Amino acid sequence: MMPLAEAGALAQGGGPSATEWACILRRKTPRHKQPTLLMVRASRRSGKTSAVLKAGRQSVSGRKNSTSKDLVTLGASSLREERGHPLHPRHRKAVHLRTRGRTRGWVQTLARMSRRTRGPVERAAAAAAAAAGGDAGHAPFPPPPAADGARAPRSPGQVTPRGLRLRLPRRESLLRGLCRPLRPLLGFRESDSAKPASLRLLQHTPSARRNYRIAGARLMRSNYPPPLSSAALRGAGPTRRN
């Protein structure tokens, strides 16, 4: 119950002002209040005690900074950092790399490097492997697999160690073109049939000649109208004249 003196003061218009009431309510009310139903569901699901839930609620409201793993309301980023997965410096996301069955931090692989960066890295790795000579107790790591879009070079003399393709001289390219099977290019004077090709209609194959015949017949039919005795000009009725 409210004391009589305080009740009389409130009745006479005294007591704290509106600003003081706002400050009192702001101090008593937490900033981010977690609903009780969600706290009960979380406690039932995970078996947490009310003290743990209260500590988590305080950490969310900003009153107390807690780094315990048992709190229900911890953020995903803090959990990732505690588990040992570093965050990417640009995207702030945990990036994993598999090395012998274990996940490690973000490392730039050879597939993502540019040509200028990949060349010195590959040469340094080859020099380190040659210096080790396989005495380290295990076999050296196999070379990284090629990318999906990359294909094997046609000949070993075409690709430099840095991955750049060399242009062949004109004589070698000419010989390379002569070594392939010679196919007749069907042009104006060439044909795959024994009959000479017409200069007016370039009919190279039997199928092309058939298409030209069909097209010519349609053209003749469209240019000249049908005769008057044709069935196209008669009335198409069910009865006929006697």
Curated annotation (Swiss-Prot):
UniProt-listed InterPro entries: DUF5550
Annotated region (Disordered), positions in chain: 43-70, 112-162
Residue stretches spanning the membrane: none
Compositional bias annotation for Low complexity: 122-139, 147-162
Pfam families for the chain: DUF5550 (PF17704)
Compositional bias ranges of the Polar residues kind: 58-70
Name this protein carries in UniProt: Uncharacterized protein LINC03040
Source organism of this protein record: Homo sapiens (Human)
